Amino acid sequence: MITKEATVIVPTTGNRGALLAYSVGSIQKQTLRNIEIFIIGDGVTDEARETIKKLGKEDSRIRFFDHPKHERRGEPYRHQALQEAKGRIICYLCDRDLMLPNHIETMSELLTDYNFASTTYIDVRADQSLNISQYIGYYGPASETKKGQFKAGISLSNTGHTLELYHHLPFGWRTTPKNYFTDIYMWSQFHSLPECNAYSHTEPTIMYFKRGHFPGASVAEREKDLARWAPEITSERNIELIKAEAFKGLLTERQQLRIYKRNVKKTNILIRGYQVSKVPAKILQMASILLKKL
């Protein structure tokens, strides 16, 4: 029975409890308050377990689903938890990311007219520089012509869908085969449904700390990054300044890319026998997918 506007799934594993004070804390500070928070434990340590239990005692909206370590990322545990969800919509947050205060409210509005939606995110780099990323330009019903956009990948934290649509999926969250990205594998199920009506929003509502930007970073180092940014997103003025800085980063990167492309076109480098300027889109797409795995 639907009694909440949103259920938020927060997967966590190992000894990452120190991050939850910040990631879950950003959920607790959402402008939309009628929510429930499901923390999905995938082999957490005793220390992390105590941290999660403490969070639950302080906020009755939090529920903890404690499981042993799964062979992948505990995907079936998410499915089990969603059988008990009471939210009209389902949102997600990686335990290393932060929600801007309006994220769930934004998703709630989008998922009134659509049943699958994504926002963009503010990409935080290792040097603390900012960018805006992951606008995939996907609108309307799922179709074969838009399949590539789904394959481009949407991160967990900036994706949401209705609970009703989830219950129409053939499988729901399930163990991801080796060499597949967990999120892309899951979102492809939504794409397979004729009733999937998706929307890509341009507004950044997540602060995203990509694992690849912080190679080998310890939990303590990640905690420092979250501690640095979490207080900054509690004021509207600061958030607007952060967005402006991220937009500047996006424009700067685009300009650098244009300069790079001009220089590359002047070289004699061949890619699979093609001049760089004439490389087929399929090869470039494959290269993009491989780079994302780094």
Language-model-derived ranges and their functions:
Residues 243-294:
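Boundary detector for helix-to-coil junctions that initiate low-complexity/charged tails
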